[in-house]
Structures are given as C-alpha cells and as structure tokens.
Amino acid sequence: MQMDWLFIAVISGIGLLSSGVPGTQGAYTTEQCRALNGSCNFYACFPKNVIIGKCDWWGWSCCARTPLERCTAKKGTCTKTGCTKTDTDHGPCDGGAQCCQRDPVKYCKFHGNVCGRGKCPMDHIPIGEQCMPGYPCCKRDGPAYCKSKGGKCLRRCSQIVPTDIIGVCADGVPCCKSRQSTG
C-alpha cells in the first residue's frame, strides 16, 4: 500500500515537471522562450546569458544571450549613434544603443563603386574590400575609363580642337574627346 502512494507521488511529480506547474501563469512556454531567442534551462543559465523569464516547468528559466552577446554573434557592434544607410540593423543593445553591422554591398555602392563578379570590370580597379567572398568592390579607374570611351587624359582639353569633356581622369585632370564631325 505504501509503495502505491510512493508510485503515485513520483508519477505526479513527473507530470508536473512535464506539463507545467499550476499557478505559473505568465511563464513562457518553450516555444515562446525560443521566439525570444532563448532556451529553457534547469535553474542556471549558461555563462554570458541572462534570465529573461520563467519557463512553464517548475525550476526552469528562460535564458537568452545578453544584447551585447547577441550583437557580437551577428558580427555587429553596439553604437549609441544608431545605424547608417550602409549598415544592417540587428535590433537594440543595452542603454538605447543599436546593434549595427556594416553591409559590404551597400557600403561599396554608397561610395559610387560597383561589386565585381569574380573580378572588376575592364575600366575598374579593386579597392581592397569585398562585397562578398569572390566579389571585389571596384572603383572606376579614371584613365582606363577615359581610354575605353575613346578619350585622352589632358590637363587642357584645348590641345584637341574641337573637343568635349566626357569625364574625369583624376582630380583636376579632365577626360577629353575630340568631337566627331557631323559632316
């Protein structure tokens, strides 16, 4: 008879652990905890994690990374000034800061450059940054671009008569192209 009561008590205890303890309203289900980028752990959280609530099992806590750890895992940095147009916003950090990560494609294009496919286009040169692995960020090479358009880099376009300025080779040096006769 005593073994029957002990058996019932053990089974009841297991049932409480697996189905939630009555009176823990407001506690997270496992799915709710996961939706908050957390996990239900028994009593203690892993290092660098914080308790963000209770799970609906007795003695379990919903643990998640700190905002700084979450940001670092996404290769971002927490900044108080907010994200720029060339950043990807990964959400809030502590103290009103934002988790920002430079988007290499946006950054390359924002500065007037292009992303090459394996290599830069003929009239461009790589600038040492990558849009993504195997895709260099390429800057237009003024002299090569000028030459590809049939022009010449000259300090004074008046050396070619008649002439049009069709671009810039470098600071202060125009790309000059002779006008075609309209005969």
Swiss-Prot record:
GO BP terms in the entry: defense response
Tissues in which the UniProt entry reports expression: Expressed by the mandibular venom gland.
Subcellular location: Secreted
An annotated GO cellular component: extracellular region
InterPro entries for the chain: Defensin_beta-like
Coiled coil: none
C(6)C(4)C(9)C(6)CC repeats, residue ranges: 27-64, 65-101, 102-139, 140-177
Keyword Secreted: yes
Signal peptide: 1-26
Keywords: Repeat, Secreted, Signal, Toxin
GO MF: toxin activity
Family the UniProt entry places it in: Belongs to the beta-defensin family. Helofensin subfamily.
Function: Lethal toxin which possesses an inhibitory effect on direct electrical stimulation of the isolated hemi-diaphragm of mice. Neither hemorrhagic nor hemolytic activities are detected. Phospholipase A2 activity, proteolytic activity and arginine esterolytic activity are absent.
Name used for this protein in its record: Helofensin-2
Species assigned in the record: Heloderma suspectum cinctum
